[in-house]
Amino acid sequence: MNTELTELVFILDRSGSMGGLESDTIGGFNGMIAKQKAQGKKVNVTTILFDDEVDIIHDRFPVEIIEPLTEKEYFVRGCTALLDAVGTAIEKMENVQKHLPEDHRAGKIIFVITTDGLENSSEHFTQEQIRRKIEAKKERGWEFLFLGANIDAGREAEKIGIARNRSVTYENDSKGVELNFKAVGRAISKAVESDAVMDFMDEHWADEIQAYKEGKK
């Protein structure tokens, strides 16, 4: 295992209900990637955009070569095939890690899932299949963060095997999206710096997102 290598997998909702937040999502993502570049650590990035289709735009790219996300890649449309996006991402990473030499396998694997609505159009994976996959990967040290708007993110995360303390319900507005990416960026930076290969996530990663959400009530 290469304890200096981190695999980041971003699964970003671009379904039609994200309309109006395109520039915030693009800017937040680009800012987060810039932070990882500046950190200078060995990080590979996979980025998956989903609506009723699943589109892989970065396939384990070294973070230093990632070009800024633009409206050419991130544009809203369609429904929410969340389970298909997560299942595709897990199977892809699982297959890669399985076939790499032991000393090339990542010491840390972190999935970041964002959605602003409930699953409504997956065709290839069921909720139970995803739950089993995630629970199996968590036993091997993989981390999963789940950020959801317009839903009870904790409840929806638990349905697919992600603990409540790895989930947060965010406010689906410009500030809420901005805080999402900042919080995730900080959490990832701390994880990348950590020497641990298990339990390396900051337990308070979502505090600022939650505080903003509560303040909007």
Residue ranges and their predicted role:
Residues M1-K217:
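Acidic, low-complexity intrinsically disordered regions
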